[in-house]
Amino acid sequence: METLTAISRWLAKQHVVTWCVQQEGELWCANAFYLFDVQKVAFYILTEEKTRHAQMSGPQAAVAGTVNGQPKTVALIRGVQFKGEIRRLEGEESDLARKAYNRRFPVARMLSAPVWEIRPDEIKFTDNTLGFGKKMIWLRGSGTEQA
């Protein structure tokens, strides 16, 4: 199975991302419901600008994060670790992402929080259901995938 396909299928079944940013040596993490865009390989989230993590991100920042399930046994562990960039969307980009986000999470229609894009440059997918410690790595723009 192609690495990005396996990652995308698993991410489509999850809904909470944890992401971390840093500013002047201070780290902060946050959680949010996400929409994953398979074509752009990007997460879309809503978060208020007044939050600590948004303030630390500014309009654009380096980001790292995870998506994981809560399995009861080690043999069922699956999860994603990533690094990349987070940025606040504006204009048409924001409008299109918000429409898609609202389709997945209709309750979000009541929120006015800005839309942010988390664009991973590297994704590591651990899937113990394929064998203990099985890892797949996707790198943006490299033209290669490591399994």
UniProtKB/Swiss-Prot annotation:
Q: Which organism is it from?
A: Escherichia coli O157:H7
Recorded family membership: Belongs to the UPF0306 family.
Q: Which gene encodes it?
A: yhbP
This one is known as: UPF0306 protein YhbP
Please give the NCBIfam families that the UniProt record associates with this protein.
PRK03467.1
* Top-level taxon of origin: Bacteria
